[in-house]
Each structure stands twice: as C-alpha cells, then as structure tokens.
C-alpha cells in the first residue's frame, strides 16, 4: 500500500517547525531529509525515523518499513515541537 498524499501532507505539516526539511517520492513512499541527510521516511501511511539510541527515551515502537529493510521507529506524536526535537536530535547524530 502506497502512502496517501493526505498523510504525506499531514506529516509535512508536523515537520513545519524543522528547518531544512525536504522529501523525495520513491515507489509510492517518501524519503525524508534534513539538510540533505536522510533521517526517516513515510511508508504505508506511517511516519518512521531511523533507529537511534539517542531516541530511546521516547519508547517508539520498532517496525520494518518494507521487506529486508532495517528496523525503524514509528513516530506517533502530533506535537510539532516534539517532532522538531526528535528530528534535530537524530540529525546531530547522523551528520557526525
């Protein structure tokens, strides 16, 4: 099942507080970037971010976005300011 345009717009609205966000549509799903660094994606109407020890405090559910993929974390929050904190924390770790 591909991600709906409505869900994509919903997630992009959640990311409105984060600077440098972009996306690329691939095979019906979306890859998410911050300043050209991949931090997550939208798969089957699920907002997922890369697994990281720096995000353990949030206790996100681990999911597999598609067969043979690495485990990712399901972001089920609706607060754009918390989402901003999560993305910025992950970006700092990934851009080292």
Annotate the PLM regions.
Residues 1-96:
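Charge-dense, helix-prone N-terminal extensions
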């Amino acid at each position: 099942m591909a991600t709906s345009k409505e869900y994509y717009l919903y997630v992009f609205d959640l990311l409105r507080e984060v600077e440098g966000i972009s996306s690329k549509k691939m095979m019906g799903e979306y890859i998410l970037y911050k300043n050209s660094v991949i931090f997550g994606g939208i798969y089957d109407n699920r907002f997922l971010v890369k697994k990281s020890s720096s995000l353990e405090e949030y206790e996100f559910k681990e999911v597999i976005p598609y067969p043979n993929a690495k485990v990712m974390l399901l972001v089920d929050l609706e607060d754009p300011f918390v989402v901003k904190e999560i993305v910025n924390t992950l970006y700092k770790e990934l851009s080292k």
